[in-house]
Structure formats: structure tokens, C-alpha cells
Amino acid sequence: MNKLLLHLVRVISILGLANALTQTQPILKDIQITDSYTKTKECTDPDHWFIIEGQLSIPKGSQQNITFQVPDAFSSFPQEPFSIKHNSNSVATISRPDKSTNNFTISIPEKSSEDITTTFNFLAQLTSDAKSKVTEPKSIVYSFYSENTMFNDVIDYVAKNTSAITTDGGIYKTNNTAWFTVDLPMRTFRNPVYLTSQTSSSSDYVFDTSLTKFEVVTAVDSFNEPINAIPYTTVHDYSTEDEIRCLFNSTISGGLYFRVTYFTKKLSTSSISNTVELTYPDEGTSVRLLGKRDTSTTLASELYSESAANIDSTTSDDTTSSDAAITPTYSNSTLSSYTSQSSAIPEVAVTASLSSGILSSTVDGASTSADASMSAVSTVSSSSEQASSSSISLSAPSSSNSTFTTPSSSLSATETYSIISSASISVTQASYIDNSTTTAVTQSTSTIAVSSAEKLSSTLSYTSNVTISVSSATQHTTTPSYVSNSTTLSSSSVLESVISSPYLANTTVSGASSASQSTNPPYVSNSTTSSATQLATIAPFAINITGTSISSSITNTSSVSSTTSSLSSGPFVSNTTVASGSYILTTTTESAQLTEIGSLIPISTITTSTTTSGTDKTGSNKVASSTEIAQSIVNNSSLSVSTINTNAATAAANARNATFTHATHSGSLQPSYHSSSLLSSTIDTKVTTATTSTSRDGSSSLAFTTGLNQSVVTGTDKSDTYSVISSTESAQVTEYDSLLPISTLKPTVVTGTSRNSTFSMVSSTKLTEATATDKGDAYSVISSTQSAQVTEYGSMLPISTLETPTVIMSTDESGYFTLTTCTESGQATEYGSLIPISTLDGSVIYTFTGESVVVGYSTTVGAAQYAQHTSLVPVSTIKGSKTSLSTEESVVAGYSTTVGAAQYAQHTSLVPVSTIKGSKTSLSTEESVVAGYSTTVDSAQYAEHTNLVAIDTLKTSTFQKATATEVCVTCTALSSPHSATLDAGTTISLPTSSSTSLSTIITWYSSSTIKPPSISTYSGAAGQLTIRIGSLLLGLISFLL
């Protein structure tokens, strides 16, 4: 802090108070400001809350109001009025009458019977404009005014001390969760150390351990905040919801400092406190603490989500400071092992080097590092006396050849090689006893040679052309997370060799005299394994695997039918889904008014990006690749979608006529697919049919066939559970649960000639009766009508849409499936379902009522027959509707199909439907019924919405599909009764009972839009009528009344 500047402003403040001391009215003696997190005048983060503290003097008998002004750089003040207390009694209040200014008024409600001097405080934050001016460390003077008196105070904005242990934290306003950081200097990790963070006794919150991050900071800004960091994974994390607890027992080097970031779940209070403790285990005493002056056992912190008044005193206390520069202390016995931290380097050769810095390890185990930026040749060698806990970190971003060699002395500790982005690096370790871990990250060509080792573990995070040579080792484990092209892993004399690779290509594993060797690649292409006494291969997705000299009796194989795949060349289009939190959903009606709906269900926004080359991304995702014939192969992989480019295309192309083998160590067959993708397409209202065959082991195969045209194949990865509410016209509510929300995907178009897909699943079918389920919860559904009005319905029970029992087909739950539907307009909607779609081709449902037929995802076949599918998407009832062909009203429907004279079957979908102004249904034009995600022809338009709440209450547009069955008891032409299906789409009336007079039936038949045979003669006495079709006289038909 600039002490001279502070003294000057204090002198000015004292001179200003000289007059005030002689007055009898209340006065402010002082106003100061401190950082609420550090409890000092030093601030390492401008986002911190600041404590404004004033000292008030109230003379005996005084009751006058006074004012004071806070600098315009501050805002976010507490709710006023708030009290000023003395001995727990309120003696005054503070308010801000004009909220547009920073002028405060202190009001004294009663005259005091004695002289009172007390303090008050409240929280404030810098405004956005004030924060933008703090771009580098500086000291800023803030001036407060009260009754012609100025009080000045200084805040020093300083960079954090990277050589000390520091903490930081805050509370997000968006979701009311807290974050914490602990920054540790690299020397903290000379010995194993525990980091523990807990809530204080006055706070009640839990940690979200899934979000904890560990990073090595390699570049910082002017405040020493990270601008570049590398993730670090070698941490023993024992954290729970109640505490963060981590053990670091590895040497960490190569960065400026180490950062631990962790988070809480949603908070229930506006302020919390936290403690951080560091301990060294196994150092003679039961607990070895890192503390300031060896007196502080914890680092405490207070966080606030909103402003408050009268918080704890801001008096600085050295023994409880939470953000001070706390230097790790060590006993003399500990320091003895680090007395020699550098030594002469026996051999250093640097040629054509712009910058080169090399530090060799010592006898006591200090680290060896090399930075050979832009060098052509770099050589580092260490002496043969190197003994314990050595670490070699190599950084050669642009070097051509770098060689690092350690001699063949007997070692007993861990050797760590970190090789980053080099053209050619060779690391040779002659001999050691315990173990060695070799890590090669993002490099082109590397050679790692070990002549003798008891245990060797090689981890290759992202490599190409890496050679690991082991002459003699008891156990050799190689784990390349992503290895491609010409990778050779060899060992001449290894007792046990294990190769574990989620993604390998062109890999050769050879062992001249290996007692045991196993390969576990979930995705392997073109692999060869030879010369192993016992070989175990587990490859859920393997192509062209060759094994020689194998002696094993524990391999079982199961296979599924091959698929023919073909991918066109070009960039791979991937989709990214962002979904979190609470959303406000806005929909538009025909008159351009907006209806706003609040929803707790996230709405997924799918953005399309084109990737032409692979990226270094890992994680557990589903990788979907589409083929020319609209098939989809889904595999679980450690690679995100964006990394599947030409390699994935090549692998898919190589899958032609291949057998997928799943080898296990048990005697029973296991399925090769743990997850499947179910693909269905609808183009030009063509029918999708399915055939099901069940094998002896209970599995079923579904074959789907559709017509010709383009299709869209894409997929997303969702795993949460949401509740979907749908409403019907009669103001009833039905709730449905779905494992996946609806995602609207922008298209990836694949051109093909046909779509024939076969999928395998374990399922069994059974006939069940559709029933209604009572639910005890209350729901409120808001839907918009065609006239831009909003109707809200509330109901305690869901709807039962059928008056008579209807037999439908359902399937048992049998694992996880993904359903993707496509439209001709190149958009796709994906549904997640536990129940696969099962198609009943040609099934017919009739109701002899005034209501329409209720079906789920129906398509038209022949004479208005229905193919019904069971689905997680509910179906609406269209009650009492009729067809109007003379108006110009828009037809609004969800997933509608047209049959006959512009009749349609309406379905309630998880994707809403928008009203398109000006569209109409006309039999004399080629315009189609406008619907959400519908197939469009000629001049028809369509609209796209992403919405989880269906809008299906229509005010003026009503339609009816009623199917009646009339049975002829006596027929002349037939020897047995038959049924005639008649279309009563636009009728005058509908016969309601068998006692209806025949004249009524004649009138009804004559008015039918399908123009049934005309009735020219009717004889009531004889019970006969004459039927003509054109000029053809069919004769007399007798009937019974």
C-alpha cells in the first residue's frame, strides 16, 4: 500500500474534523473501506464485496439528521432502512431516499440521554464501470463526504502471491451456488500433503464433487490469475458432499502454481463460510500443519451473495487472516533432504538454440527439467548417483531432436517423463527396480526405451508414432488413450504385458517371451498380437483382428449380423447441446402475439459445427455415425463427437461384411451391443412397416422399411428425467414421464436409395388394455389458440381418452434406445424411450360414437385404415369436431396426415405446432395441411418450434374422423353377413341406435361425401329397397327392420 498517500489523506480528514468536534449535533468521525474477503486494505479480486464502516458520535440530547455520500464507484447496497446499534439497542437508522444517488441519511428517532459513540457497516460492490478501470495492480483513493467533511481511504489492488498459499471464492447470482479456489505453490508438493475444505459450524451447504478441477497454471495475467492451465489428474480424491479431501503424493512441476477449484450445490442462505486446511502425513507428529507463523491451523473465508448490514467486525487479526501470504514451513529434519536443490550438469549440448534452460536432478531427488524452445538438438544426461523420487519434465515445443538419458544404476522410486508437443524425443532409462510411468502428450514421434524394470506403466494420452521398447520387465502396462497409425509397442522379455486402449489403430504388440499378455481395446482396428503364452482379447467392436501363437481356452465369442456401411467424404458435422437451468418459453400465435410459458424443463439448443480434423477431447459420449442407407451405429467411446472425422469414416467403411466379435472369460454368451439406436423415417406420409422375429434366447429383431428420398440421421446425448405435461381440448391434463427431453437438430442430409435397417434388442411383446391412471398432483397447462388468446387449465386427474377399451400393442422395457424421426425438410427430432416403437400393420379401431378415432402416430392405409404405434408421445381426443371446407381458416395440427376429403387424425406431440397465417385447406389446390414438422409440398409453408409443452387447444378449427360400421344382416350377393366401412366425415346426423327408421338411414346415406349407391325405390311393407350404381340396377335387397 502506498503509505505516504494514506498518511496525506488521513491528515486532510483530521483537519476536516477539527470544527466538527466542537458541535453538538451528531457527526461522523470516520468512514473506512476494507475488502470483505481479505479483511484488509488489500484486494486481489475486484469482484469481492467491500465493507464500508463508519464511526458515529451522537451528543447527549441530540436528534438531528445527518447525511453522508458514498463514492459513485460503489453500488449494490443493502435494503434500507437498517439500524445503527449501541449495546444491542437501535439508536439510529440509515436510509437512501433517492435510489438514483449514493446519498444516505442517518435518522435519530429519540434524543439520547448520554453521549454515544458507535460504529456501523454495510456491504457494497464496485460498479461495472469501476471494475473495468482496475486492469492492473494499483492503489485507488475513495472519498466519502458528510456534512462538509471529506473522508479518504485507499484500497490497494494487488496481484496474489504465487509463492504463498492463497484462497478465493464467490457466489454465482444466476444459480445461487458458490465456488472456491485454493492456489498452492509448487514447493507444497515436496512431501505428500492432504488438502481439506469444510463448512464452518455456522454454515449449512454441501459440495458438488462432480465439478472439482485440478490444474497446473502455466501463464497468468497482471493479477496472477490464470490465462492458461493444464488439467492434472494424478490426485487421490476422497471428497464427499460434506468435505473436499484430496491427497497429493506425486511430484508436481512445470507450472507457476497449482490450483484446486471446487463448487457447492444450491445454497439456502445468502452468506456462507469455509475453511481450508493443509496437513502433512507421516512426519513424526500425528498432524503437521501449514500455517502462518505456525499459529493458524486453517484458512477461513466468508462469502456473500447479496449486500447486508451490521456484519462482523472488520478489525484485522493476523491469527485469523484468510487470504494472507501463508508460506509453508518445514522442520529442520525435513529441510535436510532438500539442502541441495541444484547441481552441475555432467553433459549439456544445445545447438542452434534461441532459449534453453536446464536443471538437473540431484542425489537427493530434486527434479530435472529442460526447456529447449526452438532448438535443433538438445541432450540432457544426469549422473548415475540419482537415487530417489526423481522427475524429468521435458518441454520442447519446436525441437527437432531431443534425447534424455539416465544411466543404468539401481533406482527405487518413480520416474515420470512429461513430453509435450515435440517432433522427435527419445527417453531412455537403463535400469530401475520399483516402477516407471512414462507420459507422452500430443507428440509426433517419440521413443521410450527401458532395458530393465520390475514394473513399467506407459500412458500415452494423445500420440502418433510412439515406440516403447522394454528389454526386461516383470509387468508392462501400456495405456494409449488415443493412438493412431504406425504405433509399435514391443517387449522382448516381459512376464506380463497389458495393452489397454479405448481407441487404437494399426497397433502391433509383440512379446518374444511373455508369460501373459492381454489386450483390452473397446475399439480396435487392424491389430496384430503375437508370441504370447496366454492371450485374452476383449473387443466389443473389433475389425480384422489376427492372433498367432495363442494358447487359451477361455475365449467365448458371440456375433451379430454384419452391416453395410458407406460414408461420403468431406467434413463431419457434429452437434453440440447446451441445456441447463430454468427457462422462459415464448411461442407465437397467428396474430403475432406472444405467449410466455415458464418451464423447469431445459430446452436443448442444437448448434451445428463442421469439424475437418480431430481435436484432443476425451470424455464418455455416444458417437453416432450415419451411413448412406440411413443406418446408425452407436458406440460408447471416450471420444466426443467432434473428434470423429476421417478416422471414424474409415472405420465405418471397413465395417462392410464384418463380424463383430465379443470375447469374454466366462462360458455364457453376452450381447455385443450395450446400447442401440432405433431409426425411423417418415417421408411424404409413407408407411413405415416393421417385422419382428424372436430367437431362441429371447432376443428380437426389428426390420424397418420406408420409401425413397433423403433422410436426416443425427443424435444427441441426454440422460436426465423430465416430466412432460400435455393438455386436450376438454381442459383435462395428462402427465407423462420421459427419460429424455426433445431436441431439435439442424440437419445432416444423407442421400440414399433405400432405407432397410435391422436392429437387435431383447424384448417381448404382449397385448395390454389401455387404461387411465389417476395422479394426485395438480398441474397447470397454458396453451394458445388460433386467435392469439391464452387459456389456462388446471386438473387433479389426467384424461382417459377412450370411452371403450382399446387393445394396443406394447413392449417390455429392455434397455435404453434412442428414436430419431426425420422429415423431408431436413430437420430431425430425437426421442429417448425405454420402450421401442412397435408397428402393428393393418390393425383397425372403430368407435360407433360422435368422437373421433384416437390413435397414436397414425398413418393412413387404404380405406382409412390405421396402423397404430405405442409411443411415449400422448394422443389428443378431438371431441365433437367437424370438417369445414368453405372457410379460409388455418388447419393447425401436430404431426397431421390428410385422408379423403381433407380429414385428418390429430396427435399431441412433444414438439408444438405453430399456426401459419394465410394457409388453408382446399381441395382444388395442391397445398397441404400445415403442421409443425410436417411434410410440405408446393406452396405450403412450415414452421419450426422447440417446445416441451404442446399447444393443441384450437378455438375455431375443428375436424372429425368418425368411422361407422353398418352390418347387413341379409345380403343378396353374399351368403354370409359382411361389414362395409363408410366415411361419415361430413354428415347431417349419425344413427345412434338400431331402431332408427330406414328413411333416416336413406337421408344419412345420401348426404355422405363418398356418395354411396343411390336408393331409388323403397318398399316398407315388403322390407325391400332398390339400389342403383349409375345405370346398373343391382336388384332388390331384403332386410330386417
Curated annotation (Swiss-Prot):
Keywords: Cell cycle, Cell division, Cell wall, Glycoprotein, GPI-anchor, Lipoprotein, Membrane, Mitosis, Repeat, Secreted, Signal. Glycans are attached at residues 65, 103, 161, 175, 249, 332, 401, 435, 465, 485, 506, 526, 544, 556, 635-636, 657, 709, 756. Induction: Exclusively expressed between the end of mitosis and early G1; inactivated before cells pass start. A lipid is attached at G1020 (GPI-anchor amidated glycine). Residues 1021-1041 form a propeptide. Residues 388-410 are annotated as: Disordered. The keyword Flavoprotein does not apply. It is a lipid-anchor; GPI-anchor. Residues 457-962 are annotated as: 9 X approximate repeats. InterPro entries: CST_Regulator. Sequence repeats lie at residues 457-492, 577-606, 613-647, 716-745, 773-802, 811-840, 849-886, 887-924, 925-962. GO terms for molecular function: cellulase activity. Transmembrane segments: none annotated. The GPI-anchor is attached to the protein in the endoplasmic reticulum and serves to target the protein to the cell surface. There, the glucosamine-inositol phospholipid moiety is cleaved off and the GPI-modified mannoprotein is covalently attached via its lipidless GPI glycan remnant to the 1,6-beta-glucan of the outer cell wall layer. It comes from the Eukaryota. Seems to be involved in the correct timing of cell separation after cytokinesis, as separation of mutant daughter cells is delayed. Could either be an enzyme necessary for glucans-degradation of the cell wall at the neck region between mother and daughter cells or a regulatory protein controlling this metabolic step. PANTHER family: BNAA05G11610D PROTEIN (PTHR34659), PROTEIN EGT2 (PTHR34659:SF1). The number of the intragenic tandem repeats varies between different S.cerevisiae strains. This is Protein EGT2.
